[in-house]
């Protein structure tokens, strides 16, 4: 097995239920489930989960399942968040109920409806915070918001991740 698959998952206060080909993680931030591939065994003992397989063909998949399970456990206990910044004159974000309203230089504001299980907040007019238990969905929502106006390389205007570094280009010289 891979090094990732051999590493045990510390559950902490998370309750992990394995029933047939379905794994459910329940914690303070919510509940997540995963359809487990047949042939991969998940053993839960003393607050630690380990994975094993008999099939040589499933060895690479075991590491992937372990990483997804680890993210599920972290998500339902701590949660995940992604921070976005709006750079540009007149670029603003505001919450209208549960919907996010973005003014990004278009002729109309963009209204983004958050999917189930995702919380979007705006600490300031130029910051957006996407939070949730499912790492994949949090990243997907943040990418969709960023796609409305990607940062451009000349002035750096647009929606960017807070930790993203935009490589700048020099303007054309006459």
Swiss-Prot record:
A Pfam cross-reference name: Ribosomal_L6
Regions crossing the membrane: none
BP-aspect Gene Ontology terms: cytoplasmic translation
Record flagged with keyword Chloroplast: no
Entry's Gene Ontology molecular function annotations: rRNA binding; structural constituent of ribosome
The keyword DNA repair appears for this protein: no
One annotated Gene Ontology cellular component of this protein: cytosolic large ribosomal subunit
Key words of the record: Ribonucleoprotein, Ribosomal protein, RNA-binding, rRNA-binding
InterPro entries: Ribosomal_uL6-like, Ribosomal_uL6-like_a/b-dom_sf, Ribosomal_uL6_a/b-dom, Ribosomal_uL6_bac-type, Ribosomal_uL6_CS
Family assignment from sequence similarity: Belongs to the universal ribosomal protein uL6 family.
Its job: This protein binds to the 23S rRNA, and is important in its secondary structure. It is located near the subunit interface in the base of the L7/L12 stalk, and near the tRNA binding site of the peptidyltransferase center.
Subunit structure: Part of the 50S ribosomal subunit.
Protein name: Large ribosomal subunit protein uL6
Gene: rplF
